[in-house]
Amino acid sequence: MMTPIWRKMRPICVSAVVLATLAGCAKDTPYAAPSFGFSNAYSGHKAGAPVLLENTAWWKGFKDPTLDRLVVRALQDNLSLAAAKERITEAEANLQAIPGGVSLDPSLGVQRSKGIGGTPQTRSTATVGLSWLLDPYGARRAQGRAANARIEVADAEADAAQLLMLSNLSTAYIDLRYSQQVLRIRHQEINSRRQTLELTQTLFDKSSATRLDLLRAEARLSEAEAAVPTARSAVLRQQYQIAGLLGVAPGLLDISLDDGPMPRPAMSANVGIPADILRNRPDIRIAERIYYANGAEIDVAPAQLYPQLSLSGAITLASIASGAPGGVRGAEYVFGPSLTLPSLPDGPRRGALAAQESRARQAHTAWQSTVLSAVGQVESAITEYSASAAAAQAAQKTVRLYQEAASLTRDLVLRDSATLADLLDAQESITNAELTLAQNQRQLSLGFINLNVSLGSGHASGRASGQEVAPISN
């Protein structure tokens, strides 16, 4: 036999069961992942096997311990990476900020009163409020899916920040070693032209050279010395940039950046196949997750077009105590559904829905554009890397030939079979050829960096990639 309280509570319980059943019937709009028509291989490159490059430490291909140490330090202390990680924390907090379907609102209160000449009384109350908003259109779940996607966007942005940092740091390091190589070439040029000046002075003293020859030799030496300050300034500038990328003030970096050789890639980049960039490039994952989030937010808008049903109530326990023996205790409760109708006209809300659908289509177009741009960047990087390798090889041969020509010219000058002007020109040709070789070696190294960055290689190296995100409860 039902008690009077249960008899009164039964309609409420039945309503709760019905509401839960209706809420469970809500269906999400199915998500169709965007697709792109990739070729089987990059142009001018043999078809390979799919490869995951997220943890590839491609910079170790330079076999440069100093660069390896700089990368390890930058992964720990780079300020841009720290800011990107905080954006992940913010996105996770935004997910937790989405209100759930059920909320409890407890409260406690104590009130003491005393009338004129009366007995003091203390009234104590404890109330628990309950609110349950029915979500038959899955708006909250859609908000949760969108928030989860925003977390994944923030995570991919952290990967992109790491990739950019690796690119900037490696490029700055290559430029540093290039500037140091240029400085070495300038000092070698000064030594060579000083020797030529001494030879010219000796020949002038023997009346075998003219005053014009002597002036030309002095001018060439002065010209070489004038190029040194600019080269030295370039070295310092790159050292300061590297320190900044490591989050250290200039002059406080404890990793030596003194004179060192120009690093050259000791291995080829693992290119894989074009379809690999969908998972290897953070910017493509960002665009895809933004598209997903915009699609999920479409499911939020329809809820504003229809009535909203909610169940709310409260249970209050009260106690009144006075100086007299005994007291009063009691309980009261109130429960009931409420229906909120949308305001009319509904044109603004339907317009908001149409605008959200348009944003989703825009996001899809942006994804396609990002993929197309990424494929083009990889194709260009492959071509530039191959061209730089060929140019560097040819430049090495050029330097060797000019060195042989300069040595022969010096011998001919001593035998009066060539002029001092010929020797000065030969030495200048060596300097220009060595500068060209250094530039080509720099381009080869930068091409290796650019190719790996274009492939998305190493974006999660040194840390766990991706995050498991718990779905929002309904």
Which residues does each predicted region cover?
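Terminal intrinsically disordered/low-complexity segments used for targeting and assembly
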Residues: 2-76, 148, 232-279, 321, ...
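Heptad-repeat amphipathic alpha-helical coiled-coil interaction surface used
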Residues: 88-90, 95-97, 112, 144-146, ...
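Amphipathic alpha-helical coiled-coil segments and their boundaries
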Residues: 77, 84, 133, 140, ...
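Mid-chain, structured segments of secreted extracytoplasmic proteins
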Residues: 72-95
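A short glycine-centered flexible hinge/capping loop motif at secondary-structure junctions
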Residues: 204-208, 413-417, 454-458
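Periplasmic alpha-helical coiled-coil/stalk elements that build and connect Gram-negative outer-membrane
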Residues: 3, 140, 156-273, 384, ...
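Short histidine
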Residues: 419-431, 462-468
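Small/polar-residue-enriched beta-strand and adjacent coil segments characteristic
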Residues: 27, 57, 63-66, 70, ...
